From Swiss-Prot:
Catalytic reaction equation(s): an acyl phosphate + H2O = a carboxylate + phosphate + H(+)
Molecular-function annotations in GO: acylphosphatase activity
Catalytic site positions: 27, 45
Name of protein: Acylphosphatase
Domain spans labelled Acylphosphatase-like: 12-98
Keywords: Hydrolase
PANTHER family named in the record: ACYLPHOSPHATASE
Protein family membership: Belongs to the acylphosphatase family.
Encoding gene, per UniProt annotation: acyP
Length: 98
């Protein structure tokens, strides 16, 4: 299988998580979960109290991550998760907190 065929299997999603998601270890737990799923990208707090993330990897692993984000770590109270696929040539090297 060529490098291009492998790249075609990589998906990238932008995600916003709303609710009680700051000050509860959400970003740290998201990094741990992404590493466990071998995903790449980043997660960050926004000034409006939400969390945003860019998640990159195989579709099945992204689905698992999106399912996890719907509840997050125990102290979080997620009320909404929105996401959209992003077309990009950029390939992240790892998953990290911003």
């Amino acid at each position: 299988m060529s490098r291009n065929e492998l790249d075609e299997r990589i998906e990238t999603y932008y995600v916003r998580v709303r609710g009680v998601v700051q000050g509860v270890g959400f970003r740290h737990a998201t990094v741990r979960e992404a590493h466990a799923l071998k995903l790449r990208g980043w997660v960050a707090n926004l000034e409006d109290g939400t969390v945003e993330a860019m998640i990159q990897g195989p579709g099945a692993q992204i689905d698992r991550m999106l399912a996890w984000l719907r509840h997050g770590p125990p102290a979080a109270r997620v009320t909404e998760v929105t996401f959209e696929e992003r077309r990009t040539e950029k390939r992240f090297e790892r998953f990290q907190q911003q």
